């Protein structure tokens, strides 16, 4: 579960290494974000020469959460870290590669480009 001030890794090759959540999108009372939700975040650490710069405000979609959650079929899934992928205004990823596994829930949220770039979908 991601909320304001949560820090997470970046799972793409935009050059950003760490994000800090500023806002969870989806209404004024929305407090938590899980897999497939969109957030507004700022880049806290970045590699030099990358397209994402430190201090830049970006949109990102959550691809992994450390908190375990139950799927409708009864299975439970939990990842080792919190991670997000930086997206543009149209919802397409800014990077050209995605690192690490992503959750199957992204397919239901219509993030097909992220699903196709990911090395593993759990």
UniProtKB/Swiss-Prot annotation:
Transmembrane segments: none annotated. GO terms for molecular function: large ribosomal subunit rRNA binding; structural constituent of ribosome. GO terms for biological process: translation. The keyword RNA-binding applies. Pfam families: Ribosomal_L14. Keywords: Ribonucleoprotein, Ribosomal protein, RNA-binding, rRNA-binding. CDD domains: Ribosomal_uL14. PANTHER family: 50S/60S RIBOSOMAL PROTEIN L14/L23 (PTHR11761), LARGE RIBOSOMAL SUBUNIT PROTEIN UL14M (PTHR11761:SF3). This is Large ribosomal subunit protein uL14. It comes from Herpetosiphon aurantiacus (strain ATCC 23779 / DSM 785 / 114-95).
């Amino acid at each position: 579960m991601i909320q304001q001030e949560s820090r997470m890794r970046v799972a793409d090759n935009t050059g950003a290494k760490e994000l800090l959540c500023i806002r969870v999108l989806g209404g004024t009372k929305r407090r938590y974000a899980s897999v497939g939700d969109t957030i507004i975040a700022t880049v806290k650490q970045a590699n030099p020469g990358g397209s994402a710069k430190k201090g830049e405000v970006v949109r990102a979609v959550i691809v992994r959460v450390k908190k375990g959650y139950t799927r409708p079929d009864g299975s439970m899934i939990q990842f080792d870290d919190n991670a997000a992928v930086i997206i543009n205004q149209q919802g397409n990823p800014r990077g050209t590669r995605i690192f690490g596994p992503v959750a199957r829930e992204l397919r239901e949220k219509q993030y097909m480009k992220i699903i196709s770039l990911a090395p593993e979908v759990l």
